[in-house]
């Protein structure tokens, strides 16, 4: 079968000397959609409609910074020799786990300052986070990055993928696993599940199940990728972090049920920062 190659330009348009890339546009769309989804849950929980503004702003800002720092740390031999590249984020190089860590810390701090319950806020935003991640992976597709190992065109056709995906997985003379798509589908499925089971879960468990679901998918999909950050020659950083997140999340669900028996997410109104008992 002949190849009809419809290459997608990573640059959406130019504003003078500034190139606006599809990656940034798609990330922004993911954040906005996530915001609107979380906003509905926020109002339903009885919280002020402006509550999410500061949380999203600081979590996104510090999440982005942490994502870059995380990437630089695990690529330190290169950046030690090229320190000027550290701030050149437009050359690529961020890591989602770093973003999650930075965003989590910032979110908890904002909750403390605003006297909000971090478990309740976590449950509200968890489906939005994984939805934004699922959308954001299409930014990797537009950049022709974060793909898996080599495959044949016949393999991709057997997946019944649209031609524009198949054709844009042809990179430098070789077809590759569309790992962006695998993770996007996994994340969107996680979003659907979390939204539908949240009302049946206890406070805090939606967020922990988000971490568990995302980490399970990331562990297996990461094994297909060719651009993984490596801790050693055999250990991928993302897989190790995924295992830790799964263990920590499940342990916290069990511990909190035994120790505190928190209420159902759907049975509480607006909650303050926890004091004696973590609810």
Swiss-Prot record:
For membrane topology, the record states: Multi-pass membrane protein
Q: What class of enzyme is it?
A: transferase
The protein's GO terms of the molecular function aspect are:
phosphatidylglycerol-prolipoprotein diacylglyceryl transferase activity
**A GO CC annotation given for this chain:** plasma membrane
Write down a Pfam family by its short name: LGT
**InterPro entries (UniProt xref):** Lgt (IPR001640)
Function per UniProt: Catalyzes the transfer of the diacylglyceryl group from phosphatidylglycerol to the sulfhydryl group of the N-terminal cysteine of a prolipoprotein, the first step in the formation of mature lipoproteins.
Protein's UniProt name: Phosphatidylglycerol--prolipoprotein diacylglyceryl transferase
Provenance organism = Staphylococcus aureus (strain JH9)
């Amino acid at each position: 079968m002949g190849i009809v190659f419809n290459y997608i330009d990573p640059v959406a348009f130019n504003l003078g000397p500034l190139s606006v890339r599809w990656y940034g546009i798609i990330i922004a769309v993911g954040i906005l959609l996530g915001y609107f989804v979380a906003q509905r849950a926020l109002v339903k929980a009885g919280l002020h409609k402006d509550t999410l503004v500061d949380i999203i702003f600081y979590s996104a800002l510090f999440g982005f910074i942490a994502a870059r720092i995380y990437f630089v740390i695990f690529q330190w031999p290169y950046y030690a020799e090229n320190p000027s590249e550290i701030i050149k984020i437009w050359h690529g190089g961020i890591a989602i786990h770093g973003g999650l860590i930075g965003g989590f810390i910032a979110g908890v701090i904002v909750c403390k300052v605003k006297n909000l319950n971090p478990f309740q806020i976590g449950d509200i935003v968890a489906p939005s986070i994984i939805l934004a991640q699922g959308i954001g992976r299409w930014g990797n597709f537009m950049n022709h990055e974060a793909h898996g190992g080599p495959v044949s065109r016949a393999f991709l056709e057997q997946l019944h993928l649209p031609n524009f995906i198949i054709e844009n997985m042809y990179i430098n003379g070789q077809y590759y696993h569309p790992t962006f798509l695998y993770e996007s589908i996994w994340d969107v499925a996680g979003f659907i599940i979390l939204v539908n089971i949240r009302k049946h879960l206890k406070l805090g468990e939606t967020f922990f199940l988000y971490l568990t679901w995302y980490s399970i998918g990331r562990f297996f999909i990461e094994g297909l990728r060719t651009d993984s950050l490596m801790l050693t020659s055999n250990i991928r950083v993302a897989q190790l972090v995924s295992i830790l997140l799964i263990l920590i999340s499940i342990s916290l669900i069990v511990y909190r049920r035994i120790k505190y028996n928190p209420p159902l997410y759907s049975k509480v109104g607006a909650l303050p920062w926890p004091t004696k008992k973590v609810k």
